[in-house]
Curated annotation (Swiss-Prot):
Protein name: Adhesion G-protein coupled receptor D1
Transmembrane listed as a keyword: yes
The organism of origin for this protein: Bos taurus (Bovine)
Subcellular location: Cell membrane
Signal sequence interval, chain numbering: 1-25
Segments forming domain GAIN-B: 399-585
Amino acid sequence: MKKLLPLCCWHSWLLLFYCDFQVRGAHTRSHVHPGFEVLASASHYWPLENVDGIHELQETTGASRTHNLTVLPSHNSTFVYTNDSAYSNFSATVDIVEGKVNKGIYLKEGKGVTFLYYRKNKTSCISNPAQCGPEGVSFSFFWKTQGEQSTSIPSAYGGQVISNGFKVCSRGGKGSVELYTHNKSVTWEASFSPPGHYWTHVLFTWKSEEGLKVYVNGTLRTSDPSGKASPAYGESNDNLVLDLTKSYENRAFDEFIIWERALTPDEIAMYFTAAIGEQLSLSSTPPSFSVTPTVNTMAPTNAYHPIITNLTEERKNFRRPGVVLSYLQNMSLSLPNKSLSEETAFNLTKTFLNTVGEVLRLPSWTAVSEDSAVVPGLIDTIDTVMSHITYNLQASKPQVAIVGSSSMADFSVAKVLPKTMNSSHYRFPARGQNYIEIPHEAFHSQAWTTIVGLLYHSVHYYLSNIQPASTKIAEAANYKNCLLSATSYLISLEVSPTPKLSQNLSGSPLITVHLRHHLTQRQYTEATNESNRIFLYCAFLDFSSGEGIWSNQGCALTEGNLSYSICRCTHLTNFAILMQVVPLELTRGHQVALSSISYIGCSLSVLCLAITLVTFAVLSSVSTIRNQRYHIHANLSCAVLVAQVLLLISFRFEPGTAPCQVLAMLLHYFFLSAFAWMLVEGLHLYSMVIKVFGSEDSKHRYYYGIGWGFPLLICIISIVFAMDSYGTSKNCWLSLGNGAIWAFVAPALFIIVVNIGILIAVTRVISQISAENYKIHGDPSAFKLTAKAVAVLLPILGTSWVFGVLAVNNQAMVFQYMFAILNSLQGFFIFLFHCLLNSEVRAAFKHKTKVWSLTSSSSRQANVKPFSSDIMNGTRPATGSTRLSPWDKSSHSGHRVDLSAV
């Protein structure tokens, strides 16, 4: 702290000096800094640091008020030496307040609580700001991150300041102030960057008609002018407490001051400059102010060297992005207000940006995109440093420009007189496909104009997973579950005074932003997927609320495609192209229609498949039904039946539950088994029609291994490696997000391709036979054989699933309906073509009926001759000549292909 000249030391010295001046009268008022008068008007003051006895608990009897400062009688005064000031050594007498617990302000510590503020009325202006009247109230303190508590400096440690009326806290890399009025039940809240390793001054004011304002290091950072209704306040403390939170880092407080009125911006500026030991020059138009250096106007490069060196050394200890951000923010606020030569400004800019670039490459930053506040906060800090450099850049000629490149960004720092600009526009960068252009007519000021340009090289990689609800992009908020991500470089341009631009996007002049897209592999895959809609937004980081929020207000995308975007904007700031990928969703009408088709079709299929299995079981004694072809039909029917029953049941379970997860595993197995048996159907058809090989018995065990064993193996592997992918998304099925769905899609696509090939080959053979039959017999019905064969084979080969591949977007809606109809009715078509309309099944059923009839009559007439054993064995009895069907004619024609398999 001594090394860096902390702000709190100046504050302590100034207050002690002023108290000594009032008590002893050793000086004249003409030499007093105007900030002393602001300090003297305070209602209460606690030094907290470097004050012996501050941790002792004492009774406050006979407390008196002197010079508007809360003090004790002189015999309780504490004599303080402040000998660590970089400017001079002084000693003075300061009186502090100490008293009973439950009466005011406290320090929370491991050994207990130290009393600091005594007030008989618990509903005071401090504990309830509504009691302050129209004058309002102001609270001021210094705050910083403290790594380890020092035993030699009894600072007040804590992570928050709380009372019954307000709370100041720092959590997760974000500072905030909350203020509550009990009579109207209204809460005011404002956020700001929390302190880091440097002392940071926080001052906030509140007035009923102005609301809450938060000043950090003398500058207004954020505000809440209106507040919001709040029936209950989260904390309940009649006293003011400096609290030690459970955060991983400690924070130290110093110089706590209360004014029972709202300070003006000028008063805040005077007080802050007095605290840091600078002279104040007030302008005629408050609240702006400038700090006038007390030394020569030119500062050598080494005036900034300690800060850069310290940053380079400290980054070795950085592990968490929030800590890094706090450190950089406080470093940016501690830069000296000294003039910079061009060489010094260039070295400082490049060193700072290179250092930040090295910090971004730390392993802890790989997941920083999950924290939406860290990267915008870092960008805001960089803007602060660059603005400081530009403001202090010494202009020795009408145009001063510093242009360079670092590992972090390309940069341009310029200070120019607009009248010396000869071109029709100002462009940054001067070359390349990523740039911002400002028309010359927008530069209306005749005074010095500062321009800061930054083109970040890799920050866009960290601008992903942006929640639409946390942005000001209304269009993106319509798809709250679809995250935003940057697809271009982040480019920044700041001009002061602000250019005069049209406030209407249809007017002129406007800013032109041209950005090339740099898509990751994942972004490109999603953008080119026809099942997704892509939205591109010209967005910028809006820091008006104290934190960076993405917005597209005042910007419009005028031209572009997947490679680039051109935007027109009414303002300057940090720009990037954000992409939002929205999966295509069906309208409510289509969803209801497709769901109804699925329910009705699956229910009908379940009934038909059950009838089919019962029919095959009853007719299993007939030889024509007992062959391998009908065994395969029965196994396929069983797999499809169980899969569709489970599918209907799964609609009743909530995703993410254990039953839903179990159902997803069973659905995976039985649907995969259904596809496997479709493959068996194709292989068996190929062996019977195209290439006859082996006996049925030799292939039997292979078919069962393919139909039931292979799907089981795939499911076991999938469950072992992707257990969490089952039943966790929108339904009881495999997750689409992590690739687990390919454990079903890949085998299914393979089977569809194989079966389509088999279907084509079989269709060619049938077509040849049909043509031959037409030539020999002249039967025109033979041409119908091809169409009939295809219709019969489609349900058992599963080729109708190809419509699922074609149904990828709203433009292919007809394929979605075809897919829903054909696949939900797969069981019905199996029953129709391979049971109800199948000539062999009908013949077997007739024979079985005759057997039942003869068996029944034989029990009544013993002399009735039993039915032929051939019929019992399933062989066809000799019958009279019948007209040959086209298929029978084909066998008589001498063709060696057996089409009974079809």
